Amino acid sequence: MKKIIITFSLFVFLVFNSLPVYADGHSLGGGISSSAPFGINAQVCKLNEGKTMEDYHSLNDKFYKWTKKNDVEVTVINQIPFYSHGDFNNPDNYDFVEFLVGPHERVGRTWDTWLKSKDAQKLKQEWEDVATCYVKAASGNFLYANEEALNKIDLRYVEWNWCNIREGRKAEDLMKEHSRIANDMEKNPNGIIGWLTFLPQLGGASYPTFAHLVIYPDVESVLKNKKIEAEGGWKDRRDYETEFAQCNGPLLMQEEILYRPQ
């Protein structure tokens, strides 16, 4: 395990995690359900000098074996920037983000076992030699899920958009609007295979209130969706961001499911 950040009011957490979900099923493996909140341990990481992503992946293979041996398996996800907000004047200050995902209790038990286990100490030292990370805790909740696609596709793309609730609006207002959007998405997903809210809980004081995560199977689906937005769908985004939430603007990450518990 490594290190990260996030915090939010219990009120906002309860409301955003009480939204109905439109899904083809329920199980996403590893104890994760698309119809209930799940725990997320996020590591925002920068490779140390001279280290590569190959070094990172070789360590993860050891980590998967360790979690299986100690009965604390979690889903492991890696994201790297694809269409980021970075440029030459404001470069990205991280190389990748890793997510350990599962039921909240299991993610916590993985941490406890990691911290107490003697056989994890060598692996911990090897990890710290490869990358420097900030560790944060969050909760995820699906609003729309194509279970078959999410369980089958390991390499996909995730659009992030960080938002704050607009002054004068309550979390219940967003809950109602999100439910309406999810209902429309169920009828016509336009290439989207998943939509969830990401709620920082520990270590995220510098982050907005929540993030929308929209999952696509490939870049073609991403840009097909953007074509629809360019042809008039932008009005829906404008209305949402005018009435309900003030958002930073979307970016795209390439996501790979590195490990699914058996």
Task: Please identify what each model-predicted range represents.
Residues 7-17:
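Bacterial N-terminal signal peptides
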Residues 22-262:
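Short S/T/G/P-rich N-terminal loop/turn motif that feeds into the first structured element of a domain
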Residues 1-4:
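Positively charged n-region of N-terminal signal peptides that target proteins for export
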